[in-house]
């Protein structure tokens, strides 16, 4: 593996660990998800460029579209939660609370 692959894999792992460890605020969770999607986009782009498979050239763009949709939905949920509860805690999303 080259140094670039190792760095992208470490970026994905760091984002995943951040998502698992810092779950109190919704904004930090969204930032970690965006880091994971960016790492996946870079990995998919490198895979397509290295394989020279023309049919798979749309995969990174489709992944980028899904990342943009995920970011838009996450930010709209963040605005709705912060307007309703006044904070962006993830515990406010639990529907089983009394």
Swiss-Prot record:
GO MF, one example: NADH dehydrogenase (ubiquinone) activity
Key words, A-Z: Electron transport, Membrane, Mitochondrion, Mitochondrion inner membrane, NAD, Respiratory chain, Translocase, Transmembrane, Transmembrane helix, Transport, Ubiquinone
Catalyzed reactions per annotation: a ubiquinone + NADH + 5 H(+)(in) = a ubiquinol + NAD(+) + 4 H(+)(out)
Compartmental location: Mitochondrion inner membrane
Topological type in the membrane: Multi-pass membrane protein
Transmembrane regions: 1-21, 29-49, 61-81
Superkingdom to which the source organism belongs: Eukaryota
Keyword NAD listed: yes
GO BP term, example: ATP synthesis coupled electron transport
Any one cellular-component term (Gene Ontology): mitochondrial inner membrane
Enzyme Commission designation: 7.1.1.2
Keyword Electron transport: yes
UniProt-listed InterPro entries: NADH_UbQ_OxRdtase_chain4L/K, NUOK/Mnh_C1-like
Function field: Core subunit of the mitochondrial membrane respiratory chain NADH dehydrogenase (Complex I) which catalyzes electron transfer from NADH through the respiratory chain, using ubiquinone as an electron acceptor. Part of the enzyme membrane arm which is embedded in the lipid bilayer and involved in proton translocation.
Protein family membership: Belongs to the complex I subunit 4L family.
The protein's assembly and partners: Core subunit of respiratory chain NADH dehydrogenase (Complex I) which is composed of 45 different subunits.
Protein name from the UniProt record: NADH-ubiquinone oxidoreductase chain 4L
Organism whose genome encodes this protein: Ceratotherium simum
Lineage start: Eukaryota, Metazoa, Chordata, Craniata, Vertebrata
Gene: MT-ND4L
């Amino acid at each position: 593996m080259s140094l670039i692959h190792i760095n992208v894999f470490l970026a994905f792992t760091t984002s995943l660990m951040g998502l698992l460890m810092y779950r109190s605020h919704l904004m930090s969770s969204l930032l970690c998800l965006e880091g994971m999607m960016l790492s996946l986009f870079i990995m998919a782009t490198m895979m397509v460029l290295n394989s020279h498979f023309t049919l798979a050239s749309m995969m990174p763009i489709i992944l980028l579209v899904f990342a943009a949709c995920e970011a838009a939905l996450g930010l709209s949920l963040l605005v709705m939660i912060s307007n309703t509860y006044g904070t962006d805690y993830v515990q406010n999303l639990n529907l089983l609370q009394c």
